[in-house]
Amino acid sequence: MRLVQLSRHSIAFPSPEGALREPNGLLALGGDLSPTRLLMAYQRGIFPWFSPGDPILWWSPDPRAVLWPESLHISRSMKRFHKRSPYRVTMNYAFGQVIEGCASDREEGTWITRGVVEAYHRLHELGHAHSIEVWRKDELVGGMYGVAQGTLFCGESMFSRMENASKTALLVFCDEFIRHGGKLIDCQVLNDHTASLGACEIPRRDYLNYLNQMRLGRLPNNFWVPRCLFSPQE
């Protein structure tokens, strides 16, 4: 296994099975963040993640963290909070604000550089990247964004500026996703936060099999149309 240098003149990726074991999942470096290359990466179970100033690094870890939306863990306190939630939740109302929020709300720094913001904004304009927004009145207080692959959603990042805002985004999205035929959410790498929400690890080969099936599936044509998903009770 060796790290592959990508060419700017080809969008081809090596097989994810050739990714390094240490660091886990590192597959290639270089290339660019053009929409065509990004979409090719997601279709093959590969995603970019790198530090500012470093070359673009491409990953496909084994195992892979996923969340079956029907297995989302909702604590009793979160259930009580959601019943009296002050938040309004929308889809695709403010993609730019959400990704900017994810970039700025990281005390330890972020991989979401200006170039990354612009790249995913292009994907959004092409109808492939989507956002969930959480509002307190007219203030954006949390949200999440990711890339759609048929009935699979590749979650990229979330942020929260008020209590339970990002959890509300995920809860409302999972409910809507399930009701319209969504099957699986890719969480990439398991951490304490995603594990607490019900995410689990599966072998990479299983994830790739699910991806190959689900990316050919279809949600309703109007699923990603900008709309309100949840409003607080009066």
UniProtKB/Swiss-Prot annotation:
GO BP terms in the entry: protein catabolic process
Domain of life the protein comes from: Bacteria
Key word 4Fe-4S present: no
UniProt cross-references to InterPro entries, sorted A to Z: Acyl_CoA_acyltransferase, Leu/Phe-tRNA_Trfase, Leu/Phe-tRNA_Trfase_C, Leu/Phe-tRNA_Trfase_N
Compartments (UniProt record): Cytoplasm
A Gene Ontology term for the protein's cellular component: cytoplasm
Gene Ontology terms, MF aspect: leucyl-tRNA--protein transferase activity
EC number: 2.3.2.6
Reactions catalysed: N-terminal L-lysyl-[protein] + L-leucyl-tRNA(Leu) = N-terminal L-leucyl-L-lysyl-[protein] + tRNA(Leu) + H(+); N-terminal L-arginyl-[protein] + L-leucyl-tRNA(Leu) = N-terminal L-leucyl-L-arginyl-[protein] + tRNA(Leu) + H(+); L-phenylalanyl-tRNA(Phe) + an N-terminal L-alpha-aminoacyl-[protein] = an N-terminal L-phenylalanyl-L-alpha-aminoacyl-[protein] + tRNA(Phe)
UniProt keyword terms in alphabetical order: Acyltransferase, Cytoplasm, Transferase
Functional note: Functions in the N-end rule pathway of protein degradation where it conjugates Leu, Phe and, less efficiently, Met from aminoacyl-tRNAs to the N-termini of proteins containing an N-terminal arginine or lysine.
Similarity comment: Belongs to the L/F-transferase family.
PANTHER family per the UniProt record, alphabetical: LEUCYL/PHENYLALANYL-TRNA--PROTEIN TRANSFERASE, LEUCYL_PHENYLALANYL-TRNA--PROTEIN TRANSFERASE
Matches recorded under NCBIfam families: aat
Name this protein carries in UniProt: Leucyl/phenylalanyl-tRNA--protein transferase
